């Protein structure tokens, strides 16, 4: 679709939902090499860049439509995962990326995701789980990823009182597809 403006689309959607001029704190989490920094860079600059692994937490101010987000890219290597808990206070949403083309690491991703689900402080925080790299020939299907991560019964677009909002979105950051739906979904909870 030539000339399609992703950011204009976000602005229009958020305006229609009454989410103009809101502010939220988002954490970008997931294992190393899942695409967290690439996604953040794409959202901020609308282009790809050659990136190195994230060794230290980085913070960016990001506006999608009229919602301003303070985003934290915390890195996914083992040492960085120990710091994730330091960023939980006052978080409004978590974007958890999984490399859908690396099934050998699904169990590790599930362990980290399940550990996050057990943290009382995050009980009401929405989780947008992104199965990234669907452009890769080795990427698994959404059904396979849901099963591997234990996400067969997510909340979808239904707000259920007393239940944490969780949804899985399949995407390709490099192809600029799939992740906009995740941010639209997250915006309904901020």
Swiss-Prot record:
It is an enzyme of class 3 (hydrolase). The keyword Ubl conjugation does not apply. GO terms for molecular function: GTP binding; GTPase activity. Its main location: membrane. The keyword Hydrolase applies. GO terms for biological process: intracellular protein transport; vesicle-mediated transport. Keywords: Cytoplasmic vesicle, Endoplasmic reticulum, ER-Golgi transport, Golgi apparatus, GTP-binding, Hydrolase, Membrane, Nucleotide-binding, Protein transport, Transport. It is found in: Cytoplasmic vesicle, COPII-coated vesicle membrane; Endoplasmic reticulum membrane; Golgi apparatus membrane. It holds the Pfam family Arf. It catalyses: GTP + H2O = GDP + phosphate + H(+). NCBIfam families: small_GTP. Belongs to the small GTPase superfamily. SAR1 family. Small GTPase component of the coat protein complex II (COPII) which promotes the formation of transport vesicles from the endoplasmic reticulum (ER). The coat has two main functions, the physical deformation of the endoplasmic reticulum membrane into vesicles and the selection of cargo molecules. SAR1 controls the coat assembly in a stepwise manner. Activated SAR1-GTP binds to membranes first and recruits the SEC23/24 complex. These SEC23/24-SAR1 prebudding intermediates are then collected by the SEC13/31 complex as subunits polymerize to form coated transport vesicles. COPII is composed of at least 5 proteins: the SEC23/24 complex, the SEC13/31 complex and SAR1. This is Small COPII coat GTPase SAR1. The gene is SAR1.
